Every structure is written in C-alpha cells, then in structure tokens.
Regions:
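Functionally critical, cavity-lining and gating residues within the transmembrane helices
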Residues: 2, 35, 48
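Phosphopantetheine carrier-protein modules
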Residues: 11-29, 45-53, 57
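Amphipathic alpha-helical interaction surfaces in cytosolic regulatory modules
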Residues: 31-39, 59-61
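C-terminal structural segments of small proteins and small subunits
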Residues: 49-74
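Thiotemplate assembly-line natural product biosynthesis machinery
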Residues: 1-18, 70-74
Length: 74
C-alpha cells in the first residue's frame, strides 16, 4: 500500500521522483485542487470513503498512510 501511495502522489503531482518526505509544504503542485484529485484517486484505488475531517488532515505521505491503515487498508 505504501508504494502505491507514492506512485499515486508521483503521477498526480507530475513528479520525477518522490519519497516518504513528500507533503503539502514541499510539493508545489499539492494545492487545494490537487488535494481533491488525491482524495478521488485514493478512494478509487483503495475502495474507501473519506470524510471531510479526514481529508483535512492528509497533508503528507505519512498522514495518508496512517489514515489508510486506520481504515484497514493493507
């Protein structure tokens, strides 16, 4: 699951490379529209539904992975 999240982030934000330190703070393309696209990709890829309060705390790779794990994604 962790590698798939990295792959999604890399493709979605059009990055040449990506690592586990990626966050909204260090990714220029991770803006509000990028966040909406990210949510759609994650929901589709992992067959989950994200609540608005969950979406608001997804500001880094680590936050995304922790949230997915809390939803039982492996």
């Amino acid at each position: 699951m962790e590698q798939k999240v990295l792959d999604i982030l890399k493709a979605l934000f059009e990055l040449e490379t990506v690592d586990t330190s990626i966050s909204q703070e260090n990714c220029e393309n991770w803006d509000s529209m990028g966040q909406l696209n990210l949510v759609a990709e994650l929901e589709m890829e992992f067959d989950i539904s994200l609540e608005p309060e969950e979406i608001g705390v997804m500001i880094s790779y680590k936050d995304i992975v922790n949230l997915l794990k809390s939803k039982g994604v492996k």
